[in-house]
A protein has these predicted regions:
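The feature captures the beta-strand-to-loop junction immediately N-terminal to the Walker
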Residues: 41-43
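Helix-to-loop junction immediately C-terminal to a conserved catalytic motif
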Residues: 56
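ABC ATPase NBD coupling module
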Residues: 60, 72-87, 108, 113-114
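Conserved ABC transporter NBD signature motif
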Residues: 64-72
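Conserved ABC ATPase "signature" region
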Residues: 72, 107, 114-132, 163
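Conserved ABC ATPase signature
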Residues: 75, 136-146
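Short coil-to-helix segment of the ABC ATPase nucleotide-binding domain corresponding to the Q-loop/switch region
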Residues: 96-105, 136
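ABC ATPase C-loop
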Residues: 133, 154-155
Length: 168
């Protein structure tokens, strides 16, 4: 986990925001400490998902800075931020086995199978997915698929934070 700071963060989906109503997020100054667990609460449409997408890099803020510790990551691509995001609806490769779904982020980063296998088995055990490791993900329940989404974030040792956007 990393210290996450949001400095005067503002975001608009309007190309040239002029009115107050043009802003999805207005002047957010927040700091989340290393190792903490935090929740964003609010009604639908208030900007929770937008804020998470700004932190993960899926969106770039219209104004302000996103910092991890003292490092400004505002302009970094999502892959360079070492953030895992678990979305409301599970993102799972149905044609792959549970094992291959969990191994995907590690293989994508070029880790040798000798390092992939023990890490996948460790995370599968933690999430109680071991009995299904060699089954196709398509056969799992919604909560089993969400465990895979979570597992793909946990399997990487370089992840600084895991962001949950209304997980089941």
């Amino acid at each position: 986990m990393a210290l996450i700071r949001l400095d005067k963060l503002r975001h608009s989906y309007v190309p040239k925001p002029a009115a107050d109503a043009d802003w999805a997020l207005k002047n957010i100054d927040l700091e989340w400490s290393d190792g903490g667990a935090y929740a964003l609460l609010g009604p639908s449409g208030c900007g929770k998902t937008t804020l998470l997408n700004l932190i993960s890099g899926l969106l770039r803020p219209t104004w302000g800075r996103v910092r991890f510790g003292d490092r400004d990551v505002t302009a970094l691509d999502p892959g360079d931020r070492n953030i895992a995001q678990v979305f409301q609806f599970p993102v799972v490769y149905d044609t792959m086995s549970v094992y291959d779904n969990l191994a995907f982020p590690l293989r994508n980063r070029g880790l040798p199978e000798a390092q992939v296998k023990p890490r996948v088995e460790e995370i599968a055990a933690m999430l109680e997915l071991s009995p299904t490791l060699h089954s196709r993900a398509a056969g799992l329940s919604a909560d089993g698929k969400q465990k895979i989404s979570l597992g793909r974030g946990l399997v990487r040792s370089d992840v600084a934070a895991i962001l949950f956007d209304e997980p089941l």
